[in-house]
A protein has these predicted regions:
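Catalytic core of pol beta-like nucleotidyltransferases
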Residues: 1-25, 34-39, 48-104
Length: 104
């Protein structure tokens, strides 16, 4: 599936993810993944890897420093207890990291 975020923005996000060796996979979910977002919508990200909630907050803070007009909600997938939310992420989540060949 093609990401709803422009290539240049994905490259900036991935520059943050690359600084964290513990991150294995990042998926975009929520309204941006479904294409129902508004200009005020945040960017919902689920992270797989050895990432605890405190590290997720640090990653979100680093993303907030990027020159992009978004707010970020970063969740370690392992810590998400709500089964419907986990199912939503598995169903509509769009993998944005690691980049695939020819796709950031």
């Amino acid at each position: 599936m093609i990401s709803p975020l422009p290539l240049s923005e994905l490259e900036l996000l991935n520059s943050v993810f690359r600084r964290h060796a513990e991150i294995r996979v990042v998926k975009l979910f929520g309204s941006r993944a479904k294409g129902t977002h508004t200009p005020q919508s945040d960017v919902d990200l689920a992270i797989w890897g050895e990432v605890d909630p405190l590290q997720a907050e640090q990653i979100a803070a680093e993303l907030d420093e990027l020159p992009l007009p978004y707010r970020y909600d970063v969740q370690p997938f392992e810590n998400i207890k709500l089964l419907p939310l986990r199912a939503h992420i598995e169903r509509v989540g769009i993998s944005i990291y690691p980049p695939r060949p020819n796709v950031p």
